[in-house]
């Protein structure tokens, strides 16, 4: 029973972290994009529709090239990642989907997955992105 209570605590922590993170991430993406790299670890990797971007400088350059955006998140799911898979690093998997318009153009459906790791200091815990995978989910016309 103690294991179930402990796991529920991890799940609750993951959900709180994911909800806070998603609000911050997409607001920053839409309104303060130059600050977005602060949410990433130094050696984080982004895969954007199959294109790999690694490291803060490359991420900053990539985000600067994107047109202005309007994200709407319609779905959020999260779960803690088992500590055996992450060398005891507190990690949360966050999955989102929704719609985005770039430069006010046509709306696209998207799916985005994040691996967040807890960066703990004496005063608080900050969640940083270790891995980020973004994909458009538009239907192909046949």
UniProtKB/Swiss-Prot annotation:
One GO location term (cellular component): nucleus
Any one GO biological process: protein transport
SUPFAM superfamilies according to UniProt: NTF2-like
Protein's name in the database: NTF2-related export protein 2
Swiss-Prot/TrEMBL keywords: Cytoplasm, mRNA transport, Nucleus, Protein transport, Transport
PANTHER family the UniProt entry points to: NUCLEAR TRANSPORT FACTOR 2
Function: Regulator of protein export for NES-containing proteins. Also plays a role in mRNA nuclear export.
């Amino acid at each position: 029973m103690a294991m179930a209570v402990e796991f529920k605590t991890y799940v609750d922590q993951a959900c709180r972290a994911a909800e806070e993170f998603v609000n911050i991430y997409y607001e920053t993406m839409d309104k303060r994009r130059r600050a977005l790299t602060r949410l990433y670890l130094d050696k984080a990797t982004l895969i954007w529709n199959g294109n790999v971007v690694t490291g803060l400088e490359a991420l900053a350059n990539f985000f600067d090239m994107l047109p202005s955006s309007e994200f709407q998140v319609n779905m959020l799911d999260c779960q803690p990642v088992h500590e055996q898979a992450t060398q005891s690093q507190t990690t949360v998997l966050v999955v989102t989907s929704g719609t985005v318009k770039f430069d006010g153009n046509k709306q696209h459906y998207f799916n985005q997955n994040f691996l967040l790791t807890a960066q703990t200091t004496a005063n608080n815990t900050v969640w940083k992105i270790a891995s980020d995978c973004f994909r458009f989910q538009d239907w192909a016309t046949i």
